[in-house]
């Protein structure tokens, strides 16, 4: 939330505010305690249990605006079939699940990535996407400088790992949406989207 606030993209305080943000800037972040205070309370029991509960997993399956495409990042690769199966049971039109950076919806560009894509109740499409970078090591980021995000977005910083992560994640999303017929086409389209981005967007939002 601190990062979004820094970038001029404050969290939504209600469903109505989230909808307005999506209409205005095609992006919104709504905290779980706003979407479902009860689920937030259950997650906050983690210190009591001493471990995560299934609530952490199924909370990610919530789709409050009935988006036709969902993206799911997980940490443990052995659970991809479970999440794909849940999407089919819930009738989610399209969903992708993959092992993301730190369990987030963020493709790791320095490693091959297995992606499970579901469409309705059909059997999942399982693809292994190649690494986008030759160096298998992720560069350390001890400073966690929020201004670096702006510099990368505006093209003022040549951060190969960050750009590859963004473009790679966009590519998986495009493939999941049915906008690309292959991994190669998805990555080409994603590169074009990144190159054509509005580099002043974050400044305007702030």
Positions of predicted regions on the chain:
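Glycine-rich anion-binding loops and their surrounding alpha/beta cores
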Residues: 5-12, 17, 22-206
């Amino acid at each position: 939330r601190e990062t979004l606030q820094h970038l001029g993209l404050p969290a939504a305080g209600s469903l109505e505010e989230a909808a307005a943000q999506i209409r205005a800037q095609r992006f919104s972040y709504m905290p779980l305690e706003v979407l479902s205070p009860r689920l937030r309370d259950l997650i906050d029991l983690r210190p009591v249990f001493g471990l995560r509960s299934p609530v952490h997993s199924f909370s990610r399956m919530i789709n409050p605006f009935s988006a036709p495409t969902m993206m799911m990042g997980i940490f443990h690769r052995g659970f991809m079939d479970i999440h794909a199966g849940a999407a089919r049971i819930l009738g989610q039109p399209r969903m992708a699940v993959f092992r993301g950076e730190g369990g987030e919806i963020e493709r790791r560009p320095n490693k091959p990535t297995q992606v499970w894509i579901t469409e309705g109740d059909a059997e999942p499409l399982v693809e292994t996407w190649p690494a986008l970078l030759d160096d298998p090591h992720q560069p350390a980021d001890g400073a966690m400088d929020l201004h670096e995000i702006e510099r990368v977005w505006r093209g003022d910083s040549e951060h190969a790992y960050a750009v590859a992560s963004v473009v790679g994640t966009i590519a998986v999303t495009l493939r999941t949406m049915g906008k690309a017929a292959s991994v190669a086409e998805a990555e080409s389209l994603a590169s074009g989207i990144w190159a054509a981005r509005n580099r002043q967007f974050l400044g305007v939002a702030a």
